[in-house]
Swiss-Prot record:
Biological source species: Bacillus velezensis (strain DSM 23117 / BGSC 10A6 / LMG 26770 / FZB42)
Coiled coil: none
Highest classification ranks of the organism: Bacteria, Bacillati, Bacillota, Bacilli, Bacillales
Keyword terms of this UniProt record: Acyltransferase, Transferase
Protein name, entry field: Uncharacterized N-acetyltransferase RBAM_014960
Broad class of enzyme this protein falls into: transferase
Length: 160
């Protein structure tokens, strides 16, 4: 079983994020996000990752969003924004991305994400649904959503 860790906001994590920037697309870069929030060992980090040995090989950011401004789910409820999921080349197709998504699902809250870089098939496999595009709301993004009721694989209280 893979262990998902909340990433500390510190200079070590900053160095690890630089590895992702070498491989990833600019839109997936979290380096600037981390630099803007750097407080040594901040425990309220929105960043989560998976290590293989001592090397960070997969990561995402996960934010809780106030449902009062929620245009994606029927009951204006709080939801999670799953952002910038990325797995380093050489570690892809080993279940790391799925493990991060399952971790986010374990909070049993609706989730919104943005499909990038030909990742629609991945989100479909994770039981996310594409949202009908609305130019004013989505502003060039390709939102996908998941609600706990959409996924029969996990039961209430079960964690990934």
């Amino acid at each position: 079983m893979l262990k998902i860790e909340r990433l500390l906001i510190n200079f070590k994590t900053l160095e690890e994020f630089k590895r992702f920037k070498e491989y990833g697309m600019q839109e997936l870069s979290m380096l600037e996000d981390l630099q803007d929030n750097i407080i040594e060992n901040d425990s309220t980090s929105p960043f989560y990752g998976i290590y293989f040995g001592d090397k960070l090989v997969a990561r995402m950011s996960l934010y809780q969003v106030n449902g009062g401004t929620n245009p994606y789910f029927d009951q204006r409820q709080d939801f999670l924004e799953l952002w910038k999921l990325e797995v380093l080349p050489g570690y892809q197709n080993n279940g790391y991305g799925k493990a991060l998504v399952d971790f986010a699902k374990s909070f049993r809250m609706p989730i919104r994400t943005n499909s990038r870089m030909k990742s629609a098939d991945f989100w479909d496999k994770m039981n996310f649904e594409p949202v009908k595009y609305d130019m004013a709301r989505d502003k060039g993004e390709n939102p996908y959503i998941w609600h706990p009721d959409m996924d029969g694989e996990m039961t209430s209280g079960e964690t990934a």
